[in-house]
């Protein structure tokens, strides 16, 4: 390999390094932008979770009887008595129980 070919090889290698360095800098900027966006989204997500938790707590505090009624309806729909007379016993053939219905129909 003569001096000119060697110089041309080094020049080509140098140009390739410059192109690669420019690509790395562009990737670095993109990663930095993504990290910033990720941080912003994490903060927003945390705030939204706190807000949701606060709203759920307020809702539960305002209407605990609604949750209890929903829970009792769920048990009844699964085929169990919720009345004082037969509480916890399975309803045969999912027949209606007037005592259970009376509890569910109360306001």
Swiss-Prot record:
Domain of life: Bacteria
BP terms from Gene Ontology: DNA replication
Annotated cofactor note: Binds 1 zinc ion per subunit.
One Pfam family in the UniProt entry: YabA
GO CC annotations on file: nucleoid
Entry's localization field: Cytoplasm, Nucleoid
Major location category of this protein: cytoplasm
Listed InterPro entries: YabA (IPR010377)
Residues engaged in binding Zn(2+): 81, 83, 97, 100
Function field: Involved in control of chromosome replication initiation. Inhibits the cooperative binding of DnaA to the oriC region, thus negatively regulating initiation of chromosome replication. Inhibits the ability of DnaA-ATP to form a helix on DNA; does not disassemble preformed DnaA-DNA helices. Decreases the residence time of DnaA on the chromosome at its binding sites (oriC, replication forks and promoter-binding sites). Tethers DnaA to the replication machinery via the DNA polymerase beta sliding clamp subunit (dnaN).
Similarity-based family: Belongs to the YabA family.
HAMAP family hit by this protein: YabA (MF_01159)
Name the record gives this protein: Replication initiation control protein YabA
Organism this protein belongs to: Streptococcus pyogenes serotype M3 (strain ATCC BAA-595 / MGAS315)
Phylogenetic classification of the source organism: Bacteria, Bacillati, Bacillota, Bacilli, Lactobacillales
Gene that this sequence comes from: yabA
